Each structure stands twice: as C-alpha cells, then as structure tokens.
A protein has these predicted regions:
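Aspartate-rich (DDxxD/NDxxD/DxxxD) Mg2+/diphosphate-binding motifs
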Residues: 5, 12, 28-77, 107-111, ...
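Inter-helical turn/loop segments and adjacent helix faces that build the functional surface
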Residues: 27, 86-98, 114-126, 144-160, ...
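Conserved small/polar residues in nucleotide/adenosyl-binding loops
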Residues: 188-195
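Alpha-helical phosphate/pyrophosphate-handling elements in metalloenzyme active cores
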Residues: 2-37, 126-167
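Oxyanion-binding "anion nests"
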Residues: 164-182
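Hydrophobic, amphipathic alpha-helical faces that serve as interaction scaffolds
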Residues: 81-84, 103-104
Length: 199
C-alpha cells in the first residue's frame, strides 16, 4: 500500500490541513491524524481511479494495476480507505462524519463522471460539479479539518471549506486542460473536449 506514496506527489491536502490549523492551536496530534487520514483517502482513490481509467502510469511509475493486476489494486485502495477511517474514528463523531460525507462526495463525483451528463443537464455545470465532488471535496475536508481539530474559531470553518473546494476544482480543471493539451489534434474537433471529459 506504500507503492504510490513512495512514488511522490504534492501532498497538498496535508499541507493545507496543517496551514489551516495555524488559525487555532496549530499542529496538534488530532490535526496531524486528520492530515494523514485525508492523504491516505486520496491515495486509496488513486488506486481505484487508475483501474477505472485504465491508466498506464501514476506519478512517474507504472500504475499499480499494471504491476499487480486490477484485483490487488482495488484491494489496496480498500485497505487504505479502511486505515483512513480507523484514524478518523479515534477523533470522534465529528471526524467520522467529515470522512463519511467527504467519501460519499468523492464516490458520487467519480460515478457521475463515469456515467456522463444526462439529457437536460447543463454540461458545464455538470462538469464543475463533478470536479467539486471528485477533487474539491477532499481538499475542502483538508482545510475544514485543520480548522475544526485545531480548535480554531468556528467562523473560519465554512470560508476555509469553500476555499479548499475551489482550490480542488481549479487544480482538477488545470489537470484536465493539460491532459487535453497533450493531444493537440483533439482540441480542434467540435466534440473532442466533451468526449474526453464525458460531458
């Protein structure tokens, strides 16, 4: 389960948790547990995403499913989700609810991306909501968790949650643009972006 962790990554979620905690008591043991749990959740989601997307590589190394097969990659993601839940459960009901609500949004975002926009959906609104759920929700939880578990003033919680979600949407939007830019021939066909982004 350390394969993708050791491959690198930006660690933006734990960094934002630790930064948000500076509004309160700083990097307490609880804050550090939240930072760990949310990064572990993110790692678990990468194992699953790569299976679903059929990705060949992740963080410069072969994707886990390309090395060990789909079953092991999925089970590795599952064990990481369980370990993240164990960490959050030590922090009480508020942490459990934060993890559960975040995980629900993450899964719904992935599900909606897989299904694609339905007739009657505004494709841009649909796409942005997918980004907010799939990527923004976990970064929002990171900033929100930093506020909650550092005992920062409660008035910071919602603005920091919104801030984290917007960072997540912007990051995923940029990532999608980079993916499209790697295939310049796709950019000049009328429906290429829609097909690539499933909207």
């Amino acid at each position: 389960s350390r394969y993708l962790y050791e491959a690198g990554g930006k660690r933006i979620r734990p960094v934002l948790t630790l930064l948000a905690a500076q509004l309160g008591d700083g990097n307490t043991e609880q804050v550090i547990d939240v930072a760990k749990a949310l990064e572990i959740t993110h790692l678990g989601s990468l194992y699953h995403d790569d299976v679903m997307d059929g990705a060949d590589r992740r963080r410069g190394v072969p994707a886990a499913h390309a090395v060990w097969g789909n079953n092991i990659a999925i089970l590795t993601g599952d064990i990481l989700f369980s370990r993240a839940s164990q960490l959050m459960s030590r922090l009480g009901e508020r942490a459990i609810r934060l993890q559960a609500d975040t995980f629900e949004r993450l899964v719904l975002g992935q599900m909606h991306e897989t299904l694609g926009a339905q007739p009657g959906d505004d494709p841009i609104e649909f796409y942005l909501q997918v980004l907010a759920d799939k990527t923004g929700s976990l970064i929002a939880a990171a900033t929100q968790g930093g506020v909650i578990f550092s005992n920062a003033p409660s008035e910071y919680e919602e603005p920091l949650r919104v801030y984290g979600e917007k960072i997540g949407v912007a990051f995923q939007l940029l990532d999608d643009v980079i993916d499209l830019s790697a295939k310049p021939c796709l950019l000049y066909t009328s429906d290429a972006a829609d097909d690539s982004l499933r909207v």
